[in-house]
Amino acid sequence: SRNNAATGKVVRVIGAGDSSNLEIDLIVAQHKLETEFSDQALDEADACVLDVAGALASGYRDIRDRFVFTIDPVDARDYDDALSVEVEGEHVHLGVHIADVSGYVPFDSALDGEARRRGCSVYLVDRVIPMLPEALSNQLCSLVPARERLAMSVDITLRKSDGQVLAYEIFPSVIASNARLSYDQAQALIDPAPHDLIDAFRKEAAPFGAVELDDE
């Protein structure tokens, strides 16, 4: 009735008034972004293992001898695509390698349901809300250097003179990334000035604890 006071129940407290992350927390709440995974999905992710021998026996192609590299923001935590480039005479062989998530996420599993419901990972100013648990997104499905990983690869043969696509092939593969480059480092490799490369590597390496030694 009109004389009864309205009642309610607090279901969630979003940050605090002095929290530096309050605005981001509000964005997460406003758009109903899911930040937690179900126990079943977490259990499925934790149970995933990399079986290189099994993958090769089932038809994955072994291309671990290729020089493969990733290019991502310097603060990226998951690396889901990689490249390889080989020049042979008048042809350029370009390889595009995408982390094979399907090798770990069976159709209609709890993980599959989480991924379909979320649709993508969400990158915010101070955090990443992953599409899959970190056991997959940051580990088994992340193409980090010196680690064997399952991938879906596209081999593209280009004519060197004009970049015309001459042939392509798509196949599951086992790769091992050789290098992780930032955008600045990759651009410095493309640019002719050698000091750009040196400056980029020094700038990007410092936050990760690189130590510069004086050889004099």
Please identify what each model-predicted range represents.
Residues 2, 12, 16-17, 24-26, ...:
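Electropositive polyanion-binding surfaces
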Residues 5:
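Gly/Thr-rich phosphate-binding beta-strand-loop-beta motif of the actin/hexokinase/Hsp70
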